[in-house]
């Protein structure tokens, strides 16, 4: 599978966005001293899901799949901001 400039650029954007989203949720979990083994907590489940999603080998994906993965991380970015903000207000 050939690696093009566009594909490499897309992968770099996904890597930056996924790290940002994952770190936001991880910081929330750590700052609130949540039990990372307690799968009843939404934030812990989200953290686990994001960790698994980060393990995908992006260089093995076709460009079209990278676009879908990018959209997934955009959605998780919005979602994590929403739920973590609501938790702070409550």
From Swiss-Prot:
Entry keyword set: Plasmid, Toxin-antitoxin system
UniProt-recorded Gene Ontology molecular function terms: toxic substance binding
SUPFAM superfamilies for this protein: Plasmid maintenance system epsilon/zeta, antidote epsilon subunit
Disulfides per UniProt: none
Coiled-coil intervals, chain numbering: none
GO biological process: negative regulation of cell killing; response to toxic substance
UniProt xrefs under Pfam families: Epsilon_antitox (PF08998)
SUBUNIT field: In the presence of the zeta toxin, forms an inactive PezA(2)PezT(2) heterotetramer.
Function text: Antitoxin component of a type II toxin-antitoxin (TA) system. Neutralizes the toxic effect of zeta toxin. Part of a postsegregational killing (PSK) system involved in the killing of plasmid-free cells. Continuous synthesis of the epsilon antitoxin is required to counteract the zeta toxin.
Family: Belongs to the epsilon antitoxin family.
Protein name: Antitoxin epsilon 2
Phylogenetic placement of the source organism: Bacteria, Bacillati, Bacillota, Bacilli, Lactobacillales
